[in-house]
Amino acid sequence: MEIAREKSGAKSECIDSGEETLRESIVIFDFGSQYSLLIARRIREMHVYCELVSHDTPWEKIAHLNPRGFILSGGPSSVYEPEAPLAPAYIFESKLPVLGICYGMQAITQQLGGVVEHSDKREYGHALLHSNVINTELLADMPEPSPVWMSHGDRIEKLPAGFKSLAYTENCPVAVMGNESDIYGLQFHPEVVHSPHGKIILKNFVFNICKCHANWTMGNYIQESIQNIREQVGDGQVICALSGGVDSAVVASLIHKAIGDQLTCIYVNNGLLRREEADRTLHVFKNHMGMKIIYVDAIDRFLESLGGITDPEQKRKVIGSEFIKVFEDEACKLGQIDFLAQGTLYPDVIESVSSVSKASAKIKSHHNVGGLPAHMKLKLIEPLRYLFKDEVRLLGKELGLPDEMIWRQPFPGPGLAIRIIGEVTREKLEILRSADWIVMSEIKKAKMYHQVWQSFAILTDVKSVGVMGDFRTYGYLVAIRAVTSEDAMTADWAKLPYDLLSIISNRIVNEVKEVNRVVYDISSKPPSTIEWE
């Protein structure tokens, strides 16, 4: 352990791993892997609470989570590089179980006295895992051999003292390692779908080795959140931004359950909404929520702010900033308002900052967590910021929200502005609304609305020549986007039936006179994002 402390540069900290609190958790240290959030999802699916934190997070920042074990994620670095990120020494001193994945395994090796070197035989993609031992808790119930997903260019040349190889692949003699102190390493990614039995390993680690209990439920989360909201708000006043989506609906319902009439909901029509969206949203909220709701017509204000702007990142910044200004204006009218409630989710937080880890790059700003001006006078309250989308839906069901709201497809905070390539104008908004209405109508008619994660139209800035009747046309190109996903962190393009795509295309070019060409986006995430901007 002295080796680990010296290599991490950390001082020894006194840790009592046996302290009992109301919650137990798995803490995941992020080293910059694109799959880090998937690890968290897999643990949450087991009804065990977990959090993803930066690899250099000090003990005092996670002690309240009552960790029962640690997972070290993968990452793009090599542990033998001078500035390579390493795990804090306290995870080894805690006597708690540790599981390193890919780079995390190499960090364990390096910090505990082993040797990691560059490999001439890199492994990227599928491999077959073969066990070296008959009985091991970590690999219990794993098929022999088992397909796994590899993504590494370094290898373990020498195991740390006390460790042994538990499994191997054709090009990797140490694909799984472990010692008698329940410190393990995997040279593959058990969290991805390409490792079909990877969940077995994670379950073995969480339940059999860390001895966690599957007791983290949305019912428990509601009670805990209500207590936290009451403590945070006190006798203050809260305004909540309603969008009509499940996120803001759940936030409003949860906060209202906690503080009642201390909450005022504000619905802003920014002119970037879909057809009939404002009317439908107000109808649902007034009939099912029983809350104080203020409707704000800010169409002119938003469209003027967006005039001449074509850069997608700038659009998001402007819209986010304008939203806050609107809420500040409304807060002044209402009197003393202390908090702004938002439906920020865990993936929003991860994508918008330079990751939880300092080792990966920012993808793009999110409306809920980006574009906020430095002078913002309202304090934020974000009770969903550690939840995934599917967890928010479960929470909404637990709170008694109508299915129409719970299962509504995600709609971005910046609205149609980021589905119009180039400058946003009133004319383009009407064109896109008409095309999008057709897409949604036909998707619902085909009973595929709940089979896809999102489906929508994009108005591109491309125009092309066409022929309608005896006349030449020069119209816009509209793209159709439909994806399947679990959490929006990764997504695959939806294999919609050709007949359905044909119907949608024919309706758009015949009913939206400004459009004469329709294409279907067959890109997955990654490398593309779900939204075009």
UniProtKB/Swiss-Prot annotation:
GO terms for molecular function: ATP binding; GMP synthase activity. Catalyzes the synthesis of GMP from XMP. Pathway: Purine metabolism; GMP biosynthesis; GMP from XMP (L-Gln route): step 1/1. ATP binds at S243, G244, G245, V246, D247, S248, A249. Keywords: ATP-binding, Glutamine amidotransferase, GMP biosynthesis, Ligase, Nucleotide-binding, Purine biosynthesis. The active site is at C102 (nucleophile), H189, E191. This is GMP synthase [glutamine-hydrolyzing]. It catalyses: XMP + L-glutamine + ATP + H2O = GMP + L-glutamate + AMP + diphosphate + 2 H(+). It is an enzyme of class 6 (ligase). Residues 216-408 form the GMPS ATP-PPase domain. Homodimer. Residues 25-215 form the Glutamine amidotransferase type-1 domain. Its EC number is 6.3.5.2. NCBIfam families: guaA_Cterm, guaA_Nterm, PRK00074.1. GO terms for cellular component: cytosol. PROSITE patterns: GATASE_TYPE_1 (PS51273), GMPS_ATP_PPASE (PS51553). SUPFAM superfamilies: Adenine nucleotide alpha hydrolases-like (SSF52402), Class I glutamine amidotransferase-like (SSF52317), GMP synthetase C-terminal dimerisation domain (SSF54810).
